[in-house]
Swiss-Prot record:
The modification Phosphoserine is found at residues 565, 567. One of its GO terms (cellular component) is acrosomal vesicle. The gene is Slc9a8. It catalyses: Na(+)(in) + H(+)(out) = Na(+)(out) + H(+)(in). It comes from Rattus norvegicus. Na(+)/H(+) antiporter. Mediates the electoneutral exchange of intracellular H(+) ions for extracellular Na(+) in 1:1 stoichiometry. Acts as an Na(+)/H(+) exchanger in the trans-Golgi. Contributes to the regulation of pH regulation of Golgi apparatus, and consequently, in protein trafficking and endosomal morphology. In germ cells, plays a crucial role in acrosome biogenesis and sperm development, probably by playing a role in the fusion of the Golgi-derived vesicles that form the acrosomal cap. Can also be active at the cell surface of specialized cells. This is Sodium/hydrogen exchanger 8. InterPro entries: Cation/H_exchanger_CPA1, Cation/H_exchanger_TM, NaH_exchanger. One of its GO terms (molecular function) is potassium:proton antiporter activity. Pfam families: Na_H_Exchanger (PF00999). It is a multi-pass membrane protein. Belongs to the monovalent cation:proton antiporter 1 (CPA1) transporter (TC 2.A.36) family. It comes from the Eukaryota.
Amino acid sequence: MAEEFSNTTHESFNFTLHTTLGVTTKLVLPTPAEPILPVQTGEQAQQEEQSSGMTIFFSLLVLAICIILVHLLIRYRLHFLPESVAVVSLGILMGAVIKVIEFKKLANWKEEEMFRPNMFFLLLLPPIIFESGYSLHKGNFFQNIGSITLFAVFGTAISAFVVGGGIYFLGQADVISKLNMTDSFAFGSLISAVDPVATIAIFNALHVDPVLNMLVFGESILNDAVSIVLTNTAEGLTRKHMSDVSGWQTFSQALGYFLKMFFGSAALGTLTGLISALVLKHIDLRKTPSLEFGMMIIFAYLPYGLAEGISLSGIMAILFSGIVMSHYTHHNLSPVTQILMQQTLRTVAFLCETCVFAFLGLSIFSFPHKFEISFVIWCIVLVLFGRAVNIFPLSYLLNFFRDHKITPKMMFIMWFSGLRGAIPYALSLHLGLEPMEKRQLIGTTTIIIVLFTILLLGGSTMPLIRLVDIEDARARRRSKKDVNLSKTEKMGNAIESEHLSELTEEEYEAHYIRQQDLKGFMWLDAKYLNPFFTRRLTQEDLHHGRIQMKSLTNKWYEEVRQGPSGSEDDEQELF
């Protein structure tokens, strides 16, 4: 009845407009849009909610077990074992136990233990990438920015072309399974993402050359973003079905797409970071740390969503945003928010990394595999060869322009430290290859390569460093049991806040410029950019910051000392 009345009213209104205006063309109002309804309703929605709840429970359970494992590694000083290796091994063990439980038909957690690529790229990867940029040692990074960029951009592209081209031509020769050119390049791009978590932990423990440490660490940070952009480029070419386009046109379009993604995303992230610095410089939120911290969290995730929304790389944008916010915005924060931001990012990044490595181990039993021994062996050979073609020629080229030369021993360690990690694994699951057997072959091969590099190469890095005698003299005098490979323990002990310094910004700037022979961007940054984007701290600001920290610490300490009966230990004070 209501529908008939609505239709009658609609038609009469059209007729009224028609007669009133005296036009010859009938005026028709647009049909009302259909209401937006939930995708799942009723019993189906309830089942979806239950499934999501079990997935969350299972993920948190895995994380809790991994945290206990890391705690045991720290407590019993098993510092020779990197946390990533231990977590992957635990994931493999848990996957085997779940497989036995499913075989005995005691429970079915098949859906919960499956890794979802969208969850990785939307929830897990952004905090990891942002934290790596935010905690970056800016001095060593910018002093070696040319070398790092060459290895991360051109080196990754070389490795991707070597692996992708090798797979394509071996397939054409019927040595391994055939893949077309774009699929081969996509696999070469995703498998070129290095993640030397275990190697960096060993470098820090043995105090190797800081230049070597920064070259490997800096390359790995930019390399992740470059690898994702290259993989997206190959996928974009696949979606366009460019089989009738010449090779040169394909290459030129791929290059244009890559340059747009790389520089556009980097510019967006840099601009967002600079805007955040200006906002928090001119809007003083230091007296309300909760609002200040909330604004930082918003600006941290903002470039990722914007970049993905305009078809750029969110990972590249959030990386550069993290670097810029750490360099400028961080110094506009109150001391409480500075420390809170560092510890929160480290905690969230640790949880995300642990979750990814655990599910990487679980995937051995949960992922539908297609194993081809010749394909796996040739891919491992090509990965190692592509890394060598990347590192050694570029290192020799850079030595013509560097004062601090990259020695052959350092080149060898850089080649050996090309571990693969979570990003190749997630990218392999994200590829939309057809048929399904091809996707399973790529996924299985990627998992094997990742485990091979983490367990074998990562586990043998410390003996190799001792063998080639590249460690610092202090570390050489230590016994093996004193070497600490715990990233969690090291990062938990690091607290940085310039508010705890005794120098004002002007005094520190004058002292820094006087002590350092700054050139190029470093001089420009210290002279003009840093004063423009950061708040100038006076002695009064420093004094107020120290008082605030002491007051809050005493307050927290008193609350911690509060006994169950409500009594306090007033005799002891922290300060």
